[in-house]
């Protein structure tokens, strides 16, 4: 996993300062054809690239949205994860009670047709979940997507990630199985950016 940290200290969610005890992980995807992390994560740290519209989420916004991490492309095209909230911070991601219990991350979508990109972000997400399970004593059974959260009555009505992954032969069951396999093996290879 290629993990970096750029905490959204200018987002109202961070400023609210509410904490949670993580009981699960919720997987989201952005719903927009833009695989670049710089669209959501900013300002540029030298790896992200410049967001020409300056519409990243690390600033005051007219919407209450914030997740704990994003997975997508850096400026050089490699896939990475950016932590954007402390893992035990209450996010604004589910539109329901999962905000009080779940760590959340968004996977930046492309046009949903690039199997190579999907495989890279999928495996990055598996490694992130293995890492978070290790930190909080969770298992693969504690991982759901936004769509499953809606079915459980703890999230708003969204289709992510089940509108995308099945196009490439993947779903939440294959994802949980991949996390379980890695939890049973050695720890994932994690490159973590040093604290600044």
Question: Predicted segment positions?
Answer:
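Catalytic nucleophile-His microenvironment captured as a short glycine-rich beta-strand/loop
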Residues: 66-73, 102-107, 133
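N-terminal catalytic cores of peptidoglycan-degrading enzymes
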Residues: 1-98, 162, 168
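A cross-domain feature marking catalytic cores of carbohydrate-active enzymes
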Residues: 29, 71, 107, 145-147
């Amino acid at each position: 996993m290629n993990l970096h940290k750029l905490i959204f200290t200018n987002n109202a969610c961070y400023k609210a300062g509410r904490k949670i005890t993580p009981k699960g992980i919720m997987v989201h995807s952005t719903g927009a054809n833009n695989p670049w992390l710089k669209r959501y994560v900013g300002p540029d740290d030298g790896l992200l690239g410049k967001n020409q519209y300056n519409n990243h989420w690390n600033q005051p916004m007219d919407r209450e949205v914030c997740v704990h991490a994003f997975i997508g492309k850096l400026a050089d095209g490699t896939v990475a994860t950016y932590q954007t909230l402390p893992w035990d911070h209450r996010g604004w991601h589910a539109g329901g009670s999962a905000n009080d219990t779940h760590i959340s991350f968004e996977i930046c979508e492309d046009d949903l047709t690039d199997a190579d990109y999907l495989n890279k972000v999928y495996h990055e997400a598996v490694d992130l979940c293995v890492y978070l399970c290790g930190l909080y004593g969770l298992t693969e059974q504690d991982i759901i997507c936004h769509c499953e959260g809606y079915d459980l009555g703890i999230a708003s009505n969204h289709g992510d990630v089940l509108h995308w992954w099945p196009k490439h032969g993947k779903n939440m069951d294959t994802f949980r199985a991949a996390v379980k396999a890695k939890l049973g093996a050695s720890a994932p290879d994690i490159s973590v950016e040093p604290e600044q």
